[in-house]
Amino acid sequence: LFSDHQMETVWGMHNWPGLPAGEIAVSEGASMASADHFEMTVTGRGGHAAMPHQGIDPVLAAAHIVQALQMLVSRHTNPQDSSVLSITTIHGGSAFNVIPDEVTLGGTVRAFRPETRARLEQSLRDVSRLTAESHGCTVALDWRQGYPPTVNHQAEAIRAADVARAVVGADRVHMNPEPSMGAEDFAFMLEAKPGAYIWLGAGETEVGRMLHNTGYDFNDEILPTGTSYWATLVESELAAK
């Protein structure tokens, strides 16, 4: 994209349920976290559930891995350095009387700082391997690096906030809101070019129907505010040239 088209700055917007409709939030730094995900296979030796001593139980090893990984955030990460590690899938076995050969599990890791992101990956690798080995199992990890943190550039964030104030009024612009542990692919653009990513308030939603829920209903009433922001931003940027 950037090799084919010359760009000086990049700008993004996302509607944000929970923020009052028509209000705007702007961060002068990180607004959303990185998002990596992983899948691992814990391999033991299957056998009869009534004779566990004759096999190597990957279910027990996987359970201990899940528990051990929770320490990476709760005990090995500065509480002021927000991060999340969630195990979201675990599968193994198909019969009540058979210890399976393997168990697969997976999840996601979120962080705001690149060094925290890298450390959590390495720690997850080490803890999973060592825990599996302590049970006589092996582990194969497939780590997939996803989105980087969404980090606004300060100068552009200030310009975005000025435009927002011109559109909705100073009392309806929120500076440096609490960052979200969600992730955003616009982060790649912010790594390549200066820019800012804002949240446009969509108001309250029905309980349980947040973004990405199949029952989510976009608030059409915020469209004029969003389009006014874009038009005013363009006018402001062109006037400064």
Where are these regions (language model features)?
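Histidine/acidic-residue-rich, glycine-tolerant segments that coordinate divalent metal ions
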Residues: L1-T89, S94-P100, A183-E184
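Metal-dependent amide/peptide-bond hydrolase catalytic core
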Residues: L60-K241
